[in-house]
Amino acid sequence: MKLVFYAALLTAVLAKELQLATECDPEACKLPDCRCSSTSIPGGLEPRNTPQFVTLTFDDGVNVINVETYREVLYNRVNSNNCPVRATFYVSHEYTNYQLVNELYNRGHEIALHSISHRTPPSFWAAATYDEIKEEIADQKVQIAHFANIPFEEVKGVRLPFLQMNGNTSFQVMSDFGLTYDCTWPASAQTQRGLWPYTLDYASTQDCTIPPCPTASLPGSWVVPMIAWTDPNGFPCVMVDACTSFPDREDPDAWFRFIVTNFERHYLANRAPFGFFVHEWYISAYPAVKTALVSSSDVVEWVRNPIPIAEYRSRSCKTFRQTACPASSCGPLVAEHNQLSYWLQLCNRCPAKYPWVGNPFGLN
């Protein structure tokens, strides 16, 4: 019955005509549902009264190898208010162990979308049609909720592969299929005073380094800008593991200065969220300093209803509905797209075929 509901949902929405976005009017665009692209602190707060959010995000599949890093870095750690730290996992389908996705969710971490195929080349994502993005992203939302047995409504965020923007289309799919925010868009120009998350009701002022970027009015679609770091040679890098230069691996003081210098650019200015955007291998090779961490969706929730840091720290910790994992080990399943054999570790019944683009549940 659940699969029938999901299938009906995926066929119920059609692409709509879009209007060109105009310059943002702060008097018309107000929280909680609209925000102009801006470096101003939400709610008119002073920096000293604003929480400094730090978001640690990981891309790609979750498996028995990289989960060991996640357990070591994230489990049994709390922020200064004694609430558990939260990271965001932008998960791609291939080679993902959905039992481990369920484990991460039950530990309070955010599960978000990174496509089913993660196909190459990046130019595919730049030109992908509405239907292609729907099959990769909207279908993945129901796929990951089903196979990891996590609440459908808790899957809120998207990051497209290779940070390749898709213009208006991906945001239209995101809006049509109940996704709240996108965290794909690099921000390399606005780094001294970073952009806070904003909506696409009106035209964005964010620089477009990996076009095409959205130009339409897409009410209620949130952008979480990926504010670039600056490497030791002064060059911007969005994914920290893609910086062209690094401190010496054996010099912990240099690494500490590298991280703190980038952090202070946020903390000593307008306290825009400080993003630590990486793949798992980087953390396992270069362990991070201890810091307070929240998820990307936590940041969006605060921006929609900003409160001073004293009030924020006094709030009760979030609670999450725990979900069971009726474990199944499935395979080998031969994939039709490449003829490779896969094993799947799921929190649901085994599919008849290897799930893939166009057949996210692996139905006959």
Curated annotation (Swiss-Prot):
- Which is one GO molecular function term here? metal ion binding
The record lists the catalysed reaction(s) as: [(1->4)-N-acetyl-beta-D-glucosaminyl](n) + n H2O = chitosan + n acetate
EC number, UniProt record: 3.5.1.41
**Which keywords has UniProt assigned to this entry?**
Carbohydrate metabolism, Chitin degradation, Disulfide bond, Glycoprotein, Hydrolase, Metal-binding, Polysaccharide degradation, Secreted, Signal, Zinc
Domain named NodB homology: which ranges? 52-292
Subcellular localization(s) per the UniProt record: Secreted
From the Swiss-Prot or TrEMBL record, give the protein name. Chitin deacetylase 7
Lineage start? Eukaryota, Metazoa, Ecdysozoa, Arthropoda, Hexapoda
